[in-house]
Regions:
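Eukaryotic intrinsically disordered, low-complexity regulatory linkers and tails enriched in Ser/Thr/Pro
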Residues: 1-116
Length: 116
C-alpha cells in the first residue's frame, strides 16, 4: 500500500482486536476535524463503505486531548501528514493500549464510529 495512513486504537480494551477497537484510515480520507468538547477532538473520515448513498455520511474518531489544545493537536496531525514518510507511511495518532501518541497533548481515543 502506498501513501500515508492514520492509526487509532481506543481505550475500550487492552487488546484492540474487535470491531471499533482500532482502525487505520488513509490520510486522503480525512473530511475534517472539529472540537467536540474542551478536551475532545473529533476527526471525520469519508466512509470506507462506498455503498452509502448519503453524501454527508462520515465515519469518525474521537480523541481525548489536553484541555483547549485543539489547534495544537490539529497542527501536529497535519505536520506529521506533511512530513517525510517514515515507518512506511504508518502514522500512529492514538494507540491507547500501548501508550503511543502523536502529540503530548493527545491522551486518549474514546470513540471509533464506522458505517456498516
Amino acid at each position: 500500500m502506498e501513501g500515508k495512513y492514520l492509526y487509532f486504537a481506543s481505550d475500550d480494551d487492552t487488546s484492540p482486536d474487535g470491531a471499533g477497537d482500532s482502525i487505520l484510515y488513509p490520510v486522503n480520507s480525512i473530511a475534517g476535524m472539529e472540537p467536540e468538547a474542551s478536551n475532545s477532538l473529533k476527526i471525520y473520515f469519508k466512509p470506507r463503505n462506498t455503498s452509502s448513498f448519503v453524501e454527508d455520511d462520515h465515519e469518525s474518531v474521537s480523541i481525548t486531548i489536553t484541555g483547549n489544545k485543539h489547534k495544537q493537536v490539529m497542527d501536529a496531525i497535519i505536520a506529521e501528514i506533511n512530513s517525510g514518510s517514515r515507518d512506511g507511511g504508518f502514522i500512529t495518532v492514538a494507540d491507547v493500549p500501548n501508550s503511543i501518541f502523536l502529540s503530548s497533548d493527545i491522551i486518549g481515543c474514546t470513540d471509533i464510529a464506522v458505517l456498516t
